[in-house]
């Protein structure tokens, strides 16, 4: 990334949109001497073009410039490190949710219960939405897949392996490998 950043005009603000570990923007700024920001995007592989066009919110450093570029969007002012953590927190939670509902599906199957009825009852509460509760998932498989969740869970677990979140993610990753083989 440093090669690309160094080839850009010096007065060009640089926002990285892909998922990067917390602290990466700061390191890139220090290495290149440029202002490098992170502004995560929230895309689904199946609908990435529409998702990109209709991002509901924008957050990162230099929020005033972004208000001009993205008028009418919800703007949240935060550091790039906070934005980097938002993206990981979002994706890892999605993977946790998929894994949890796959476990509930598995229990329902073993107990002779109708998962769709149980799911509908759970979703009747306003605390949980239906995103990531479909079993099997949109790809027709169990567990989480795609390009983002597996790599993000692995990276987050590795980065925080000695922290409680790292300890939580190890069994999630193991369970997911069982579900994906299913």
Go through the PLM ranges and name each one.
Residues 2, 6, 13-87, 156:
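Rossmann-fold dinucleotide-binding core
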Residues 5, 98-101:
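Short, hydrophobic/amphipathic alpha-helical packing segments
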Residues 6-9, 123:
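Alpha-helix boundary recognition
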Residues 10, 88-90, 141-142:
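A short, structure-level motif marking secondary-structure boundaries and short turns
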Residues 36, 90, 134:
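Conserved active-site segment immediately N-terminal to the catalytic lysine
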Residues 60, 90, 94-98, 146:
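Short-chain dehydrogenase/reductase
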Residues 84, 102-182:
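Interdomain hinge/lid region at the active-site interface
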